[in-house]
């Protein structure tokens, strides 16, 4: 099974080029939109000026200091997240660990997250097989592309795990103050929902281009898992979320994308 899926992934997604620095996907010189860019179109804009002003009034800290702290926290989070992704990619691919260019408190936090991943691996990956890591996929009809952090096969249940690694301070599971934009207005504007939509698009593309080319694939088409694994800053262990396959909702988004292309 693993070899068949790996061969199909290579065959069906072989024509893509990815510029990591600019985060641009191209297929046969056509630029494809990323899954994250599509989803951002349905997320209310974060008004840093207005929100930092409110926080400043509430806390007594100057607005400029608050904004600067947010910028620094974002930069540090990206540095740690990039290094963690690289460690996990090498680990699950049985490649040697490359010492990251991370120093000081960020290195301390990175090592903590590495320990969290090692614990996750021990508790959840035993007996499972890694199909691939950092798998770039795309769909020619919608001209959309993205990268699956990790695809895992469970031979006992005959299902796949579509995994997204996160290193957030915390994943918001609800947001009673804000919803996504139409046609997704029934969903709260939370990390959980946005990551679930992202994984659902990845799964839909793989289902369409890979799984449907495999005989007797009904079980893993219907029963595979979409999984968010977060390695939070302020906790000692990982947190795992098995999310819904939001197939109908992402079909709505992709159909809107198709109309724009016509």
Annotate the PLM regions:
Residues 138, 153, 227-229:
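A generic structural motif
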Residues 140-141, 175, 182-185:
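Gram-negative outer-membrane beta-barrel domains
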Residues 138, 167-170, 231-233:
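Short, solvent-exposed loop/turn segments at secondary-structure junctions
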Residues 85, 148-154, 159-175, 179-180, ...:
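Conserved catalytic cores of phosphodiester-cleaving nucleases, focusing on short active-site segments
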Residues 143-145, 158-160, 237-240:
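Short, mixed charged/polar active-site loops
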Residues 73, 102-106, 181-193:
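Short histidine-centered catalytic/ligand-binding loop motif
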Residues 1-141, 145:
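Nuclease catalytic cores
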Residues 189-196, 200-262:
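Metal-dependent nuclease catalytic regions and adjoining charged, substrate-binding loops involved
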């Amino acid at each position: 099974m693993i070899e068949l899926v790996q061969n199909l992934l290579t065959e069906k997604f072989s024509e893509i080029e990815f510029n990591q620095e600019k985060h641009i996907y191209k297929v046969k010189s056509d630029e494809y939109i990323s899954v994250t860019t599509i989803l951002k179109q349905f997320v209310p804009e974060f008004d840093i000026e207005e929100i930092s002003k409110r926080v400043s009034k509430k806390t007594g800290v100057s607005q400029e200091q608050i904004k600067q702290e947010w910028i620094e926290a974002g930069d540090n989070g990206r540095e740690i997240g990039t290094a963690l992704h690289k460690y996990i990619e090498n680990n699950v691919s049985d490649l040697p660990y490359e010492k990251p260019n991370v120093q000081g408190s960020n290195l301390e936090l990175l090592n903590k997250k590495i320990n969290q991943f090692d614990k996750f691996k021990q508790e959840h990956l035993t007996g499972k097989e890694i199909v691939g890591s950092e798998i770039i996929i795309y769909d020619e009809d919608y001209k959309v592309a993205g990268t699956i952090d990790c695809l895992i096969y469970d031979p006992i249940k005959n299902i796949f795990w579509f995994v997204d690694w996160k290193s957030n301070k915390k994943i918001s599971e609800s947001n009673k103050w804000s919803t996504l934009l139409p046609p997704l207005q029934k969903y709260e504007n939370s990390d959980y929902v946005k990551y679930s939509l992202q994984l659902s698009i990845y799964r839909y593309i793989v289902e369409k281009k890979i799984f449907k080319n495999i005989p007797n694939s009904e079980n893993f088409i219907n029963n595979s898992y979409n999984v968010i694994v977060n390695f939070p800053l302020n906790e000692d262990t990982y947190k795992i979320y098995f999310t819904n396959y939001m197939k109908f909702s992402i079909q709505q988004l992709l159909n809107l994308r198709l109309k724009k292309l016509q």
